[in-house]
Swiss-Prot record:
The gene is asnS. It comes from Lactobacillus helveticus (strain DPC 4571). The keyword Nucleotide-binding applies. This is Asparagine--tRNA ligase. Its main location: cytoplasm. The lineage of its organism: Bacteria, Bacillati, Bacillota, Bacilli, Lactobacillales. It comes from the Bacteria. It catalyses: tRNA(Asn) + L-asparagine + ATP = L-asparaginyl-tRNA(Asn) + AMP + diphosphate + H(+). Belongs to the class-II aminoacyl-tRNA synthetase family. It is an enzyme of class 6 (ligase). Its EC number is 6.1.1.22. HAMAP family: Asn_tRNA_synth. One of its GO terms (biological process) is asparaginyl-tRNA aminoacylation. Keywords: Aminoacyl-tRNA synthetase, ATP-binding, Cytoplasm, Ligase, Nucleotide-binding, Protein biosynthesis. InterPro entries: Aa-tRNA-synt_II (IPR004364), aa-tRNA-synth_II (IPR006195), aa-tRNA-synth_II/BPL/LPL (IPR045864), Asn-tRNA-ligase (IPR004522), Asp/Asn-tRNA-synth_IIb (IPR002312), NA-bd_OB-fold (IPR012340), NA-bd_OB_tRNA (IPR004365). Homodimer.
């Protein structure tokens, strides 16, 4: 019996007759030969229909196929050194499932607004396909890494009574007779999980009502947020470095084909897999910018151009450590050697991509945290449960958050974060 296979498994079936179910992405003909560009969700490759190898009926059906028609094929797999994929199939039989005309995304240049309007169909094209395959590898690498490190997956709520970083940039929701907000972060609940299970990570959607059209901002995006009991900041930085190195190595090992589709040079990513990330104090980063003639003073937060400049000085991610307390959230622990600083760090991706991780050692002292909540102008009652984590068995603990789409954008070398998620939600876009 002829085996049904996927395109990605073609290398295991060279010179064998196989069956596949596929979609047509493009077609061209040279008289007695029809070249079909095919996809099946696992890869893209070429099918060849020769008039002398098929019945007249099959050849006429092949001639009639339109873009994104779907059909079953039978044929023999051969090597094809000319293609990115390396294989093609000589088709001997073909049965159509659907063959409608008018597919809106033709094989020509389209503007980004048109493509986003048709995102439900654009996902079928090569570039989105490659990005989503890499996204999937990075997701699986994340779960694999943290399982090996004895973390458990911990789910935080989406509806929040209060926000971990104040009440700005929040989506308000009418929650029966109460006010609620869409989550900006699962961190505070993750800390509760860490006190119960030791090491946890949350992974889910977060929401920020940022009125920004910048290339690094969306209103809905995914965050991966580990929290670790009994862990200090330096240990957390070591963990972050191992994790990022592991995740990028998985992409290099498993997504060579997709990186080729994107034109992404894998050698630009390889230094990250070696670790040894520089730990650059905030003070030194300020001096770096000032020495470069930039208008930046101590106490300012880094903007995207500042982070971009810093990242371009390194061939791998860099930690910027110990920011001023005035520009970071209330839950961080102050540096005992300099109370004007928090024990915190942001990971800045190379090649101008800027911040992708942010983390800190968390303040573990009840009285100190209580005062920091008050100083931040927050309602103490909203955070009483959070203070209980310190009151009852509080321990030193640390955590960080990774912006998943920002990290994907860097790995894939994308111009805009909107391409790193299947259906982007932007200030001016909620459909499809």
């Amino acid at each position: 019996m002829t085996e049904l296979i996927s395109i990605k498994d073609s290398s295991k079936h060279v010179d064998q007759e196989v069956k596949m179910h596929v979609w047509l992405t493009d077609k061209r003909s040279s008289g007695k030969i029809i070249f079909l560009q095919l996809r099946d969700g696992t890869a893209f490759f070429q099918g060849v229909v020769r008039k002398n190898d098929v019945t007249d009926e099959v050849f006429e059906v092949a001639k009639s196929l339109r873009q994104e028609s779907s059909f079953y094929i039978t044929g023999t797999v051969h090597e094809d050194a000319r293609s990115h994929f390396g294989y093609e199939i000589q088709i001997t039989d073909l049965k159509v499932v659907s063959n409608n005309e008018g597919y809106p995304i033709g094989n020509k240049e389209h503007g980004i607004d048109f493509l986003l309007d048709h995102r439900h169909l654009w996902l079928r094209s090569k570039k989105p396909f490659a990005i989503m395959q890499i996204r999937n590898t990075m997701f699986k690498a994340t779960v694999d890494f943290f399982e090996k490190e004895d973390f458990i997956k911990f789910d935080a709520p989406i509806f929040m009574h209060s926000a971990p970083e104040g009440t700005t940039q929040l989506f308000h929701v009418d929650y029966f007779d109460h006010d609620a907000y869409l989550s900006q972060s699962g961190q505070l609940y993750g800390e509760a999980g860490a006190m119960a299970f030791g090491k946890i990570f949350t992974f889910g959607p977060t929401f920020r009502a940022e009125e920004s059209k910048g290339r690094r901002h969306m209103t809905e995006f995914w965050m991966m947020e580990p929290e670790m009991a009994w862990m200090h900041q330096d240990e957390s930085l070591d963990l972050q470095e191992r994790y990022l190195a592991y995740m990028v190595k998985q992409v290099l090992d498993k997504n060579e084909y997709e990186l080729k589709i994107l034109g992404r040079d894998p050698e630009k990513l390889r230094p990250t897999t070696e670790g040894n990330f520089v730990r650059l104090p905030y003070d030194d980063a300020v001096k770096m910018l000032q020495d470069a003639g930039r208008d930046f003073k101590w106490g300012d937060d880094f903007g995207a151009p500042d982070e971009g400049y810093i990242s371009e000085q390194y061939d791998r991610p860099v930690f910027i450590v110990n920011y001023p307390t005035s520009i970071k959230p209330f839950y961080m622990k102050k540096n005992p050697d300099n109370p004007k600083e928090y024990l915190c760090a942001d990971v800045i991706a190379p090649e101008g991509y800027g911040e992708i991780f942010g983390g800190s050692e968390r303040e573990g002292n009840y009285e100190v945290l209580e005062q920091q909540i008050i100083d931040a102008g927050l309602n103490l009652e909203d955070y009483q449960w959070y203070l209980d984590l310190r009151k009852f068995g509080g321990v030193p603990h640390s955590g960080f958050g990774m912006g998943f789409e920002r990290t994907i954008a860097w790995v894939c070398h994308l111009d805009h974060i909107r391409e790193a998620i299947p259906f982007p939600r932007l200030i001016n876009r909620m459909q499809p």
